[in-house]
Amino acid sequence: MIGTRQYIVADHLFLVKADETILACMTNYEPFFTDKADITDALFALTVMQGAPVSYIEEWSQDEEGQETICGHTEDGSPVFEYRFGGKTAGWLVCTPGYRDGTLHLSGFQSKSALDNSLMIQFAMASACMGTVLFHAAVVSLDGRGYMFLGKSGTGKSTHARLWLENIPGTELMNDDNPAVRVKPDGTAVVYGTPWSGKTPCYRNVSAPLGGIVLLSQAPYNKIVPLKGIGAYAAVVPSISGKRWDSRIADGLHETENALASNIPVWHLDCLPDTDAANLCKDTIAL
């Protein structure tokens, strides 16, 4: 039986239409479920079905720890994303040019991973021109404000967040891997928990004003410095998901990235994975 579910993430509504067996697997989305929204206001809709391979022209690919995402387009220009795990395809996402509608064709292998990836991609692309970005980051809250930790994979974002949780009373984990940030018209920003997290399952429907952004680097010492202008912008951009060779999306991302770099405190923390690093960071940024 086919069903439709509505979810709200970062104040954006989206719809998922799929077989009930697929919908039953979406437990990480339950905190974001709603049945009271006006579906005409939906940011996007995704239809999930079993399907045959999709023919497309490849544009770009990314392989991270055996999880490969290949991006391209069909002959008529529709965006396509293929997901491979260990070299085996899990599914193909085909979207309309504005990403408002998408269809995920499942192969029957790693279906939940293909679904999660599709919803992340469609969310990031469809919201890019609405002041919203999806970060690769860990985020904690303290005293009503959110603090994001950025860095390359393996830098220790989750470790630094854990050190805050263990050593700074009142700290809560908002998301471990993929928080969303939305910039308001007045330049302020709000960070949100999402249904997408990393090795730590943290699927919380929470939000907080964004109090600061910290770029982490491993070092044999602890030192934190503020970043301004181009330095702040360069620290923020690599952690934001987006299809930057699409000019419409790139322009939307740039506007949001510039607003964040200009209006939100950004810091660079060289650090050890220790308590002193967490305390130094907190004492500097959480004023």
Language model features by range: what are they?
Residues 156:
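Conserved glycine(s) of the Walker
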Residues 1-148, 153, 163-172, 180-287:
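A noncatalytic interaction/capping subdomain that flanks phosphate/NTP-handling catalytic cores
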